[in-house]
Amino acid sequence: MPPRRSTTLAGTAAAGCLLLLTACGHGPAHAAKDAAPTPVGAAEAPAPLPVPRGGGSEVPDDFNGDGHRDLVLDTLVTAESHADDAGIGIVYGSSRGLVPGARQLLTPEKYAAPVGGRPPAVFEAEASCDLDGDGFTDLVVTTDPPYDGRGRPPVPLQLLFGSPSGPAGRAVPLVVPDRARYGNDWPERPVCGDFDGDGAADLVLHASTGRLSHLRGPFTRKGAPREAGPPVPSAGEAPTGPAADVNHDGYDDLVVRASAGPGGATLVLGGPDGPTRTGVTLPAGDDVALGAFGRGKALDAAVGSPGGIAMRYDLPTAARGSLGTPGSMLDAADFDGDGLSELVSSGSGVRVHPGRAAGPTARGAVAVRPATTGTTRVLAAGDFDGDGLADLVLRTHRGDTQDTVEVHRGSAEDLVTARAAVTFSTSQFLAP
């Protein structure tokens, strides 16, 4: 049986994660014009503020239901090198964007269900969606339950339910019925989506090589799905989110990678019975991204690798194309509001490549240069201020004890602003 694996929240900077609404390109890049308001610096970050209370919404990643997108921070700096981080951080959104003072720290001691009679040593965000349909986004986390290597391992996933004040109370273990399991692998790698088209969020998990578990929502507050059938066949073993309805048939679809690392991938189509149909086999690569790149009516796929990016247009038809730019890490969203996807490629640098009606292009690519030095990764690409334009959130870290998070606003003219509108450090979560 393979060893326990640790994964991160889908839609972040980890290589191999699938990100919705993506374009890609390569070529001369210019810095965007500075159209952002005066930044909120890390040193001037406000004191902790109460989490705004909401009444429920359909906005993604809205844990307090106030109609504004929130930011999940799965990696926080530590007071000393090599120390365990404090937990999972949430920075809450507003009509002005993210508010660093409105924050919440989810510690395993306070929020995790005990494993083996004690708080789990592992407590990491994996996926987020409204699993119980109450208008508040819920968080799927992974833990490290004890396992002696004999028989089926326990389910490591737990559900933290949102509320008017954000995630509240302890998480509950996710219930994966025996009939939905196959083999002796860890049930892991959760992907949210409405795969059966009934309007409720489901979860797809890895069951074993060649099998997926499909848990139909809505979920109870005890962590149980409405229904779960036998595992469904799959061409791979690593379901990858976020899901998307690529062919606009009312059923979410997802990419399943052959393994957790670089390699091949398959687009699996949803339907009344869930994600049971193979749509198209994608080329091997490091990362896969879905987006409205401009060709055809359906979504397209970009498959990134150090040697270039393979394009597959109008899925599942998958007309072929290519871009001669490295793309080992891909993130995406519509930053200029034209309805087409921009691609963010990161690794050695961060570039935003504009989408065009004929497909993604290298012309007019924007280089986003963080204000601080270090290792930079994309945390999120989404609309955090409600203006209809996606924003780009970057984290630059220098070792384990220093980092800076920057929010670059989307721009109809420049794709994203060169200067960050908001900056802060995750060290704010260390404060008592």
Regions found by a protein language model. Give the residues of each.
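Beta-propeller-forming repeat regions
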Residues: P2-P432
